[in-house]
Amino acid sequence: MHHRFTPEGNQQALEFFDKAIEADANNAQAHAWKACTLGQGWFRGWVGGTQEDMFQMSGDCIARAVDLNENDFECHRMLSAVHLSKHEFQLAEEHGRKAYDMVPSDPRVLSGYGEVLVRNGSVDEGLDLLGKALELDPVPQGQLNSDKRFTDLLLGHFYAENFEDLIEVAKKIEHQNFQSWLFVHYAKQQLNVLNKDDKSFEQGLQEYAKDDWPLFLDRLHIPQEEIRNKLSEFLSTI
């Protein structure tokens, strides 16, 4: 149910997991999936509360899940995502690696761990895992297309400074989010082919209000201040 990307589906999933926990407080996966669903709902504006409140609630759920079953790869996969959201990058990598060591063929694990690796400097390894996730599961559960997988690949190519490859992958995305929109036009600027009259460029300016850019940048979860500054400088020129 939490894979139905609607407010109703999210609420139903939370109620389902609460009932599962009520029936069996030691159900590790119920705690883990509740954390995932809370994060999804908050990120999309369906669950209220501050960012700090959400980190606390989801973190408590995941910590409880790991306490109950430290050998559950789902728990480590989700805990990696929680730490990434909190910009705790080394902890994100640690739990991502644990999930990967347990189930190295799960595309969700490959994708999540790959995202962390490229951010933390293991760019080639992370990019390889992101490519494998796309190959194994091009349309993730709950999605209608491969935009998520392609957008993840853009992150890897961005860190690798494979700007030509980045632009080619971006052509396969049906609807760009802020991350893909920013990366592709940043790449074009680096190659001196940026056209500010381009339709997709103008659509991004209309869709993503400038006042929200600092928040959007923060949600890219980029550890390196130098890279954050480069992206901020690029945005300031447009």
Where are the predicted features?
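Alpha-helical protein-protein interaction modules
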Residues: E93-R97, D101-S111, E115-I238
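Acidic, proline/glycine-rich low-complexity intrinsically disordered segments
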Residues: M1-R108, G112-V123, D128-L129, E135-D137, ...
